[in-house]
C-alpha cells in the first residue's frame, strides 16, 4: 500500500487524460470488447505506467483505456491481474488505488465465472449481490494508511444496493434476463473439484471465480461505490459430466458479448445521468 507508487502512476496518467474519469471499469476474461466502444479513446499499455504490473493471461489485453462511454468519462482496465499469476494482493489491487487517485468514485467490476447455482446456464449475466472471500488472504493485511481508508472497513454492503437496483431496472428496460447471486473467489489457477463446488453451494455461493474480491475489498476501503457483474461462462465442476477449459470460458463470453455490451453500456448511461 505504497502511497508514493500510487501517486506516481496517477500523476503519469493525469498528464495524459484531459479530465478526471467518473467511472472505473475492470473487464474480465473475454469481456475486454467493451473497451473498443469507448470514444475519443486514449489507450495506455500497462507496461508504460509507472509501478503497474503486466497481465499474462489469454483474453486479457493489458491496457488502460480512457475516454467517453454513453455520456460518462470512464477509465477502463482491459485485462486485470490475478493472484494466481504470482502477484501479491497489493499488486492485484494497485490499479484500483490509482483509479481512486484519478478521481473515480464508482467502479464496475466484471468477470467470467463458473455457475454453481444449478438454475443458472452458461451465458447468463449475474449481478453480484455479495461475495465470499475464499482466497485465504486479504489485500488490506499489513500497516494501514489512513489517508487511503479506515483500518477496519465495513463490508455489509460491498456491492452498492443503489447500483444493483439501477442494474436490475436497466435489464428490465432493455428486456434482458439477469440473475443475482453470491460470488465466491478462490485463488485458482486450477478449477475447483466437484467436492469443492458442493461445499461452495452449501456455503451459499451461486458463482465461482478467481478474481474480483480483492479489487472490491480495496474499492470499499477507498470509499468507492461498487457494482459487480459475472458472466456465467460455464457450469462449475460436477454439474455437467465434462471437463472445464479456459477456451470454453472465452467461447461463451464471445457468445454473450452483445448482451454484455448492451447491459453495461445502458448501466453506464444511467449512472452518468444520476
Curated annotation (Swiss-Prot):
Residues bound to a purine D-ribonucleoside: 192, 234
GO CC list: cytoplasm
Lineage top rank: taxon: Bacteria
InterPro entries: Nucleoside_phosphorylase_d (IPR000845), Nucleoside_phosphorylase_sf (IPR035994), Pur_Nuc_Pase_Ino/Guo-sp (IPR011270), Purine_phosphorylase (IPR011268), Purine_phosphorylase-2_CS (IPR018099)
Catalytic reaction list: a purine D-ribonucleoside + phosphate = a purine nucleobase + alpha-D-ribose 1-phosphate; a purine 2'-deoxy-D-ribonucleoside + phosphate = a purine nucleobase + 2-deoxy-alpha-D-ribose 1-phosphate
Gene3D superfamilies linked to this entry: Nucleoside phosphorylase domain (3.40.50.1580)
In-chain residues carrying the UniProt-annotated modification Phosphoserine: 29
Free-text function comment from the UniProt entry: The purine nucleoside phosphorylases catalyze the phosphorolytic breakdown of the N-glycosidic bond in the beta-(deoxy)ribonucleoside molecules, with the formation of the corresponding free purine bases and pentose-1-phosphate. Cleaves guanosine, inosine, 2'-deoxyguanosine and 2'-deoxyinosine.
PANTHER family given in the database record: METHYLTHIOADENOSINE/PURINE NUCLEOSIDE PHOSPHORYLASE, PURINE NUCLEOSIDE PHOSPHORYLASE-RELATED
Protein's name in the database: Purine nucleoside phosphorylase 1
Lineage, opening ranks: Bacteria, Bacillati, Bacillota, Bacilli, Bacillales
Amino acid at each position: 500500500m505504497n502511497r508514493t507508487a500510487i501517486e506516481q502512476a496517477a500523476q503519469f496518467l493525469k498528464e495524459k487524460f484531459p479530465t478526471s474519469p467518473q467511472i472505473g471499469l475492470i473487464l474480465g476474461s473475454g469481456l475486454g470488447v467493451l473497451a473498443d466502444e469507448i470514444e475519443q479513446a486514449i489507450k495506455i499499455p500497462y507496461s508504460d505506467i509507472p509501478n503497474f504490473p503486466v497481465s499474462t493471461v489469454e483474453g486479457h489485453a493489458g491496457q488502460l483505456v480512457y475516454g467517453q462511454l454513453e455520456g460518462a468519462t470512464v477509465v477502463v482496465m482491459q485485462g486485470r491481474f490475478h493472484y494466481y499469476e504470482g502477484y501479491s494482493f497489493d499488486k492485484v489491487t494497485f490499479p484500483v488505488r490509482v483509479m481512486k487517485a484519478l478521481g473515480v468514485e464508482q467502479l464496475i467490476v466484471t468477470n467470467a465465472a463458473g455457475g454453481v447455482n444449478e438454475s443458472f446456464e452458461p451465458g447468463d449475466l449475474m449481478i453480484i449481490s455479495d461475495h465470499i472471500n475464499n482466497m485465504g488472504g486479504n489485500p488490506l493485511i499489513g500497516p494501514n494508511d489512513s489517508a487511503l481508508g479506515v483500518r477496519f472497513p465495513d463490508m455489509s454492503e460491498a456491492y452498492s444496493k443503489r447500483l444493483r437496483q439501477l442494474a436490475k431496472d436497466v435489464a428490465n428496460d432493455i428486456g434482458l434476463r439477469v440473475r443475482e447471486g453470491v460470488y465466491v473467489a478462490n485463488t485458482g489457477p486450477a478449477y475447483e473439484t466437484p467436492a469443492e463446488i458442493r461445499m461452495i453451494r452449501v456455503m451459499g455461493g451461486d458463482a465461482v471465480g478467481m478474481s474480483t474480491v480483492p479489487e472490491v475489498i480495496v474499492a470499499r476501503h477507498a470509499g468507492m461505490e461498487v457494482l459487480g457483474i459475472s458472466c456465467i461462462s460455464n457450469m462449475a465442476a460436477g454439474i455437467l459430466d465434462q471437463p472445464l477449459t479456459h477456451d470454453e470460458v472465452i467461447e461463451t463470453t464471445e457468445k454473450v458479448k452483445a448482451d454484455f455490451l448492451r447491459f453495461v453500456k445502458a448501466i453506464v448511461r444511467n449512472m452518468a445521468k444520476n
